[in-house]
Curated annotation (Swiss-Prot):
Disulfide bonds: none annotated. Residues 4-138 form the Photolyase/cryptochrome alpha/beta domain. Pfam families: DNA_photolyase (PF00875), FAD_binding_7 (PF03441). It comes from Gloeobacter violaceus (strain ATCC 29082 / PCC 7421). One of its GO terms (molecular function) is DNA photolyase activity. The gene is cry. SUPFAM superfamilies: Cryptochrome/photolyase FAD-binding domain (SSF48173), Cryptochrome/photolyase, N-terminal domain (SSF52425). InterPro entries: Cry_DASH, Crypto/Photolyase_FAD-like_sf, Crypto/Photolyase_N_sf, Cryptochr/Photolyase_FAD-bd, Cryptochrome/DNA_photolyase_1, DNA_photolyase_1_CS_C, DNA_photolyase_N, Rossmann-like_a/b/a_fold. Keywords: Chromophore, DNA-binding, FAD, Flavoprotein, Repressor, Transcription, Transcription regulation. This is Cryptochrome DASH. Binds 1 FAD per subunit. Binds 1 5,10-methenyltetrahydrofolate (MTHF) per subunit. May have a photoreceptor function. Binds DNA; probably functions as a transcriptional repressor. The keyword GTP-binding does not apply. GO terms for biological process: photoreactive repair.
Length: 500
């Protein structure tokens, strides 16, 4: 039997099912050394001063790493845990353990790619080959009907071509057994305090008590698909904001790779065979394709995803108004739908997709505040932060994305009436408005003094007055947007045809 040892570097792929770097090493009859490295750069500060990894996501990560270690131990191996820069930690392990090759799942955005390049450079003098695999999307790049650099800019075009001609491979099975680790200290999983973070307080109002790890992710899928059979109504319920069952909530486990998109797809196919095939089963795959799209767009455009001008290259004079940003961040804008969602995020690390669209629109289209401030706050606080999806969606909502539709303004009042008609969600997170009737709960600023007394809420005391006029602020920011758009087109018209 070969004594070759392969190091499998775990990143955002914290699972044993559908894991090609692991499976490939086993196919070579190699001894496997699995590693997770806590990179201190991921626990530093973002440009606007927020924690890059906040306490909710950090706790979910620690739980996921601990679950992976338990899984590997059950298979006869273990997980090495180290703290430091991977491009320094891995070469040291290569020398210590006589590693013959390094396997990992590749990423697509700049911070992660820099680490990959630095690792390859550090391993080159050691003559240790590095093999990168793709395992984060539903569709493998090799099965796309176009090259990465030719990815359609519009999601609809991407989706139609993928649905028509791209194959989706089945997930790889989890190994039944792993060879034991060589003699090496496995290392301790750090505590939140070791990462400079305080333990978040669990809020009983949370829609779901997220627990990190492949085991919990598989259990959530089992519950949502098979125990409660909720998949059959996914399309009709996915925009709800209150309760554990209104959407799959797989996103946190997908973001850290505790669940594989291909495994979810396989389970959907099984559900369609055993239960029902309808527009809801299709729609879950549709949403996974959105996730694929953002990741492939990030791979195509690189750092442009993070430019202030966005993928569209639109130079808008954004404000850095910290006073108003704090009102938005803490849920004190005077618009109940916005405030309820922002307080939910602060208290739990989660917010519905519908909520994210509304609060992002309000920050950029009503307050005119720099979209990077919102994107970085989401990065810090969201349990399910995914770099490509987060920054891609903020590009879109700010109107600077490749698939943006100009100045798309979310009418917060209409959204509230459509998705929270009786005010149950708002009252859940804004107890000061609990006494208001449905006709008033989304527009408390209209309360007469006698109504404020009757319903037990004092505007400007118990709940703030609106920070802006909803429609006047949107009109003012639309004028700024349109001026930037016209300037952008004048510049493009003045450029030679060969330039883009």
């Amino acid at each position: 039997m070969s004594t070759k040892t392969v190091l499998v570097w775990y990143r955002n792929d914290l699972r044993v099912h559908d894991h090609e770097p692991l499976t490939s090493a086993l196919h070579k009859n190699a001894r496997v050394v699995a590693l997770y490295c806590f990179d201190p750069r991921q626990f530093g500060k973002a440009p606007f001063g927020f924690e890059k990894t906040g306490p909710f996501r950090a706790r979910f990560l620690l739980e996921s790493v601990a679950d992976l270690r338990r899984s590997l131990r059950q298979l006869g191996s273990d997980l090495l845990v180290r703290r430091g820069h991977p491009e320094e930690v891995i070469p040291a392990l290569v020398s210590e353990l006589e590693i013959a090759a390094v396997h990992y799942h590749g990423e697509v955005t700049s911070e992660e790619l820099v680490v990959e390049r630095d690792l390859q450079a550090a391993l080159a003098p050691l003559n240790v080959p590095v093999r990168s695999f793709w395992g984060t999307t539903l569709v493998h790049p090799d099965d796309l009907p176009f090259a990465i650099e030719a990815i359609p800019e519009l999601f609809t075009d991407f989706r139609k071509q993928v649905e028509r001609s791209a194959a989706i491979n089945p997930p790889l099975p989890a190994p039944a057994k792993l060879p034991p680790l060589p003699a090496v200290d496995p290392g301790e999983i750090p505590q939140l305090a070791d990462l400079g973070l305080e333990s978040p307080v669990t809020d009983e109002r949370a829609v779901l008590q997220f627990k990190g790890g492949e085991t919990s992710g598989l259990a959530r899928l089992e519950e949502y698909f098979w125990q409660k059979s909720l998949l059959k109504s996914y399309k009709q319920t996915r925009n709800g904001m209150l309760g554990a069952d209104y959407s799959s909530k797989f996103s946190a486990w997908l973001a850290l790779g505790c669940l594989s998109a291909r495994y979810i797809h396989e389970q959907v196919q099984t559900y369609e065979t055993k239960r029902i095939k309808n527009d809801s089963t299709y729609w879950l795959i549709f949403e996974l394709l959105w996730r694929d799209y953002f990741r492939f767009i990030a791979a195509k455009h690189g750092d442009r995803l993070f430019y202030t001008a966005g993928l569209r290259g639109l130079d808008i004079p954004w404000k850095e108004d910290w006073e108003r940003f704090e009102l938005w961040r803490t849920g004190q804008t005077g618009f109940p739908l916005v405030d309820a969602n922002m307080r939910e995020l602060a208290a739990t690390g989660f917010m519905s997709n519908r909520g994210r669209q509304n609060v992002a629109s309000f920050l950029t289209k009503n307050l005119g505040i720099h979209w990077h401030m919102g994107a970085e706050w989401f990065e810090s606080r969201l349990i399910d932060y995914d770099v490509a999806s987060n920054w891609g969606n903020w590009n879109y909502t700010a109107g600077v994305g490749n698939d943006a539709r100009g100045f798309r303004f979310f009418n917060i009042l209409k959204q509230a009436r459509d998705y929270d008609p009786d005010g149950a969600y708002v009252k859940h997170w804004l107890p000061e408005l609990a006494g208001l009737p449905p006709a008033r709960v989304h527009e408390p600023w209209k309360l007469l003094p006698v109504e404020q007394k009757r319903f037990g809420v004092r505007l400007g005391v118990d709940y703030p007055q609106p920070v802006v006029d909803l429609f006047q602020s949107a009109a003012a920011n639309e004028a700024i947007y349109n001026a930037a758009w016209e300037h952008h087109h004048r510049k493009r018209r003045g450029q030679p045809r060969s330039r883009t």
